[in-house]
Structure formats: structure tokens, C-alpha cells
Curated annotation (Swiss-Prot):
Residues 34-53 are annotated as: Disordered. Keywords: Nucleus, Phosphoprotein, Transcription, Transcription regulation. Involved in the assembly of C/D box small nucleolar ribonucleoprotein (snoRNP) particles. Recruits the SWI/SNF complex to the core promoter of rRNA genes and enhances pre-rRNA transcription. Mediates interaction of TELO2 with the R2TP complex which is necessary for the stability of MTOR and SMG1. Positively regulates the assembly and activity of the mTORC1 complex. The record marks 57, 64, 113 as: Interacts with TELO2. Component of the R2TP complex composed at least of RUVBL1, RUVBL2, RPAP3 and PIHD1. Component of the PAQosome complex which is responsible for the biogenesis of several protein complexes and which consists of R2TP complex members RUVBL1, RUVBL2, RPAP3 and PIH1D1, URI complex members PFDN2, PFDN6, PDRG1, UXT and URI1 as well as ASDURF, POLR2E and DNAAF10/WDR92. Interacts with phosphorylated TELO2 and mediates interaction of TELO2 with the R2TP complex. Interacts with phosphorylated ECD, EFTUD2/SNRP116, RPB1 and UBR5 and with RPB1 in a phosphorylation-independent manner. GO terms for biological process: box C/D snoRNP assembly; rRNA processing. Its main location: nucleus. The gene is PIH1D1. This is PIH1 domain-containing protein 1. InterPro entries: PIH1/Kintoun_subfamily, PIH1_N, PIH1D1/2/3_CS-like. Residues 34-50 have a biased composition (Polar residues). It comes from the Eukaryota. The modification Phosphoserine is found at residue 173.
Amino acid sequence: MADSKMLVPELNDAETMGAETSRFEELLLQASKELQQAQTSRPESTQIQPQPGFCIKTNSAEGKVFINICHSPSIPPPADLTEDELLQMLEEDQAGFRIPMSLGEPHAELDAKGQGCTAYDVAVNSDFFRRMQNSDFLRELVITIAREGLEDKYGLQLNPEWRILKNRPFLGSISQQNIRSQQRPRIQELGNLHTPSSPRPEAGPEKPHLSLWLEAPDLLLAEIDLPKLDGALGLSLEVGENRLVMGGPQQLYHLDTYIPLRINCDESKAAFHQKRKQLMVAMPLLSVPS
């Protein structure tokens, strides 16, 4: 999940602790003000037209099932990990790696023999799809996750055996899909970006201490203690309507927590405070708690 593009240029070394704190306070004020514009600042969903990739054939108790593995540049990519890094992550924490994908609605089609069947369209990021085409491991991983996702979403029980159709990139027609317009909050650096390499933990990622409080009726604040880090480089953060997920570089930290409030994830902001070694997150609320 780590994404260095989430970082912004550091502040000048001459800035003091008070200036850093003031910067974060301004950040929180800005997050609170932007709550008023949340409903008009960005559409809740975006319509995409997935491009064909390849098609796999399997079956369920109801008959033949075809899954069109498609791609779109509008789908966010997963973490840019090597296969060795991914294998190690999956061995240590299977929930620590996610492949963003859009699962389309079932549509009735006819197979090559003119018999009725059901097809599903599953879209992943286009750049990741091209990488997957050159890796049997990634391709099988995507197919496994796509099958499990369809089973969970639609209550299916698919045959674990499947095969990729030759010379047929898709079955039927690929429909447009609506994906949620959600952006990860950028992690701002409060201090310099010098980050010495951190040792890889031997016992898996550590769950950091989290503090939550309401700064205002419409603003929830979070402080995540990260004493092993000196900067935001390698940190990733995902905020959903009632969930906060954070990953640390080299699997030093992992946090996945439920928040019983409706969060405006599109307007959430984050900053790493170097002197305190804390990740601070400002989360405007969609509905004010009573």
C-alpha cells in the first residue's frame, strides 16, 4: 500500500516545533471548513468503461460461469511490491495486501455453443494488468481474489477449477461500471524527509496505539503513535466511511480499525509529526453525532 506519491515537499529545517504545530492546526481548520463543500466538491461515483483483458471459464450449481478480467486506468493500483515481497506479506498477513478491483453485475450471455450462461466483469488497474500479464503468480492471485470477491458479493459457490479461454478476451459485452470517487488522504511531512532504513520486524507488523477524539461536532481527530519511524516515507493510509487502515514501511506497522461514525473520506487529511513521531489524521464527519 505504500505510495511515495502521497508525500509533499518537506518544511524548511529552520522551522521550529511551534511552527510545525501551527501548520497542523491550520490543516485541521482547513479540513473543518472544507466539510461545508463536501457534497459539491467531488462526485460520489465515476462511470468507467473497462477494457477487455482475458476471460476465465468455471461453473456453479446453476451452470457455466465466465469471468471477464478487464482493466481501467481509473481503478487505483495496488502496492508496488516485488513478487518476493508480496509472497512474504501474504505468508505473514494475508489481509495486509489488497488489489483494488471493481466487481460488475452478472449478465446473461450465450456461450460458443449457444447455451445460456452467466458472465461477470471484474476490472483492475491498467498498469497492474500489464504487469500481471507477465506473471503467472500475479495472474492466479488476481483470479483467486476475483472469484472470492464474486462469491462474497453475490452468494455464489464457484468451482475451484477454472481455465483461461484462448483467443477470446471476453464473453458477451462489457458494461460500464460505477466506481466510488475516493482518494486517499495525502500524508504531509512536518519536518525533513531524511528517513534512515528501518529493520524489518521478525514477528510481523506491530499494531500502533491509536487515540481518537472529537475536536468539534463535525471533526474527528486521530493520533497514531509510530515511534519506530522518522518520517512519512512509505506510510499508506486509507479512510472509509467508518474505517481507518494504515500500513507502515517494511511492514513495521499495520492498523485496521472500525470507527462508529460516518467519515467524509474524500476530505480527510493526514500529517506526520516528526518530533512526536505521530501520524495525525483530521476526518470531517458526514453526519454529526448526537
